[in-house]
Structure formats: C-alpha cells, structure tokens
Amino acid sequence: MSGFFQRLFGKDNKPAIARGPLGLHLNSGFTLDTLAFRLLEDELLIALPGEEFTVAAVSHIDLGGGSQIFRYYTSGDEFLQINTTGGEDIDDIDDIKLFVYEESYGISKESHWREAINAKAMGAMTLNWQEKRWQRFFNSEEPGNIEPVYMLEKVENQNHAKWEVHNFTMGYQRQVTEDTYEYLLLNGEESFNDLGEPEWLFSRALGVDIPLTSLHIIG
C-alpha cells in the first residue's frame, strides 16, 4: 500500500536518470540526418553505418577550465562526442562529432605500449594514412612531434558498471570540401583490471562534424 501512495504522490525512490547535453543518457537513442554525408560518400573515408543509434555506454572527461567532453557510445562501433564550455545547456555546446572506429588492437608488452603513444608515433604535424594526408589539429601551433594529450575518461555502461580509462589522444583532420572536414582520432587507452594489472588498447577512429539541426534525441 505504501508503494501505491509513493507512486500516487510522486515519491518514487528510483534514482533520476542522469542526463547530459541535449538530454542524452544511457539507453536513450538518437537519429542523424546523414544526407549531406551520403552525397560525399565518394570523398569521405568514414562509412556511416545508419541513421538511428542506441546509447549503450556514456562517459565524461573534465578538461578543466569549465571545458568538458561527453561521449555516448552506441551498441555498434560509433560514439557521439559533445564538447561543452561553462555548462551542459544547448548554448554551452561548442562542438558535436560522430566517430566510427576503423581499427583497434590490444597491446601486451609495456615497451610496445610506450612506443605506440610516444611523440614520434602519434604527434607528427602531418601524417599519411589510407592514402590521405592529415594535419594535426591538437596544439597545431606547436612545431615538430608532440606528446599525445592525456584525458581521464569516466565510463558507465548499461549494466551500471563504472570504470576509468586513461586516454593518450591525438587528433588530425583533412579538408574534404570548402566547409567539410574529416577527422582522424588516434587513441591509446590504458585501464586496469580487477587485479590492478594494466590493459592497453590502441585505436583509430574517423569522425565528422554533426550539425545540431541534424541530430534528434529519442527518450
């Protein structure tokens, strides 16, 4: 009976859904109007797998100074990334991108891990990949090879398991048309298992800018 009155008067003890920018949250969905990208599919390397996605995991990165990154990992190989400054309202959004993982592989030896994330391997001003030339846009004013940017990512999945990922990241871009860029994200991930042992993963992901008007949230 007490449960009936709790529901009747709005005193349900279920925790509120943790919503991020645009109301996105675990188990929510979103759709994308991908027509503009379909028209450029011969020019882009990224292959957008569909137009409707379900959020299977969420993460948050605090960059300091009021800047934050919110990531919404789908049930496939994609994640929606929203950068904000000063808050989480729509007016605080600086940038929205969709990334699709192109490749990833585990690293078992620490020496190989160190080699994979050093400045020479990840931080050149330009690189050639998939027969395209890419320009570094992370700290683009710094000459030569630079160290990857460290970002601590706090992740939660649909089972409410939580963990931290230590990211060592570098971003590159190439101009496809006058107003369209394609992005290449290099990322070394370090996490720790239940025994406190490190686990290393290196990945490459391709991304594109997502206009706010082409994004629709479900749920």
UniProtKB/Swiss-Prot annotation:
Annotated InterPro entries: DUF2491
Name of this chain's protein: Uncharacterized protein YjfK
Lineage of source species: Bacteria, Pseudomonadati, Pseudomonadota, Gammaproteobacteria, Enterobacterales
Top-level taxonomic group: Bacteria
Organism this protein belongs to: Escherichia coli (strain K12)
